[in-house]
Amino acid sequence: APVADVATLADVTAECEVVSITAPTATDNCGGAITGTTDATFPITAQGTTLVTWTYDDGNGNPSTQTQNVIIDDVTAPVADVATLADVTAECEVASITAPTATDNCGGAITGTTDATFPITAQGTTLVTWTYDDGNGNPSTQTQNVIIDDVTAPVADVATLADVTA
């Protein structure tokens, strides 16, 4: 049976995907150098460790195998598409806000989520926190001010006031 040229294959690591691996080799006493083959499906994108099995076949019914770890470990949080979110200002209430977005190195576009309760009606500034979650344990956050500032004085409806006589 072929003997692997390297006793232990090095782990292959990446944040998002591994699209291919250089095939290892083995040596056979009759056939010389043999390149390993695998039935692994590429790209490998699943977070965590995937075990790839390499098979060395000398063509004479004497195969041998060797395994290699492929480790996908996304450690990069999404980056907000806009560095600072614009303030949202209203006189009475803000019923909703268009969710901002971020870009993730593995997942692409991520839409922010918030646990803020809408409508926001409290006078003054309310800080809304947006969370961008890439699904791989790397959240990032961004804040946005919602400012409720009632600057319009009430106007009396004089058409409905009755005359008062004494």
Please identify what each model-predicted range represents:
Residues 1-166:
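Proline-threonine-serine-rich low-complexity tracts
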